[in-house]
From Swiss-Prot:
SUPFAM superfamilies assigned to the protein according to its UniProt record, in alphabetical order: Mss4-like
InterPro entries: Mss4-like_sf, Mss4/transl-control_tumour, TCTP, Translation_control_tumour_CS, Translational_control_tumour_p
Molecular function terms, GO-annotated: calcium ion binding
TCTP domain: residues covered: 1-167
GO cellular component, one term: mitochondrion
Cell compartments where the protein resides: Cytoplasm, Cytoskeleton
GO terms (BP aspect): cytoplasmic translation; negative regulation of autophagy; negative regulation of microtubule depolymerization
Protein name: Translationally-controlled tumor protein homolog
Record keywords: Cytoplasm, Cytoskeleton, Microtubule, Protein biosynthesis
PANTHER family: TRANSLATIONALLY CONTROLLED TUMOR PROTEIN-RELATED, TRANSLATIONALLY-CONTROLLED TUMOR PROTEIN
UniProt similarity note: Belongs to the TCTP family.
Function: Involved in protein synthesis. Involved in microtubule stabilization.
């Protein structure tokens, strides 16, 4: 299994357990799902209509996004202006890291990042933003949106802003 960790904070952001697609040469998108967590209701596959006393009562469960929950991502908020301020600083920091490690990737990163940021800004109200567990303000912000069907959530992380750790 490969864990994708933030190059600045070391926070775990995603793993290859999710179906990951590369977009614009700079983004990894992974579909995720809303899942129930908590409570002590264990589904053993029995038909609930044949069981007595099976009421739909609050049992301490909550519905969460599986990626957000699994990697303990923390919600954060932006308006367009603050997002643009953040993303400019973040892109500059990633570019500096690339200069050290992989200067040949800089043109691809700059071009692809510009295209993807325009997509995000174009549909800004539809996006949700999360930080890693450490909530490091200089680290990557994980972006979450929904596919065209309106029900399938996906997360987006910057390919050049992660280290891959094989475990």
């Amino acid at each position: 299994m490969i864990i994708y960790k933030d190059i600045f904070s070391g926070d775990e952001l995603l793993s290859d357990a999710y179906d990951i697609n590369e977009v614009d040469g700079v983004i990894y998108e992974a579909d995720c799902a809303m899942v129930k967590v908590g409570g002590d209701n264990i589904d053993i596959g029995a038909n609930p209509s044949t069981e007595d006393g099976e009421d739909d009562v609050e049992d301490g469960t909550e519905v969460v996004n599986n990626v957000v929950h699994s990697f303990r991502l923390q919600p954060t908020g932006f308006d367009k202006k603050s997002f643009l301020t953040y993303i400019k600083g973040y892109m500059k920091a990633v570019k500096a890291k690339l200069q050290e490690k992989n200067p040949d990737a800089i043109p691809t990163f700059e071009k692809g990042a510009q295209v993807y940021v325009k997509k995000v800004i174009g549909s800004f109200k539809d996006w949700e933003f999360f930080t890693g567990e450490s909530m490091d303000p200089d680290a990557m912000v994980v972006m979450l949106n929904y596919r065209e069907d309106g029900t399938t959530p996906f997360v987006a992380i910057w390919k050049h802003g992660i280290d891959e750790e094989k475990i």
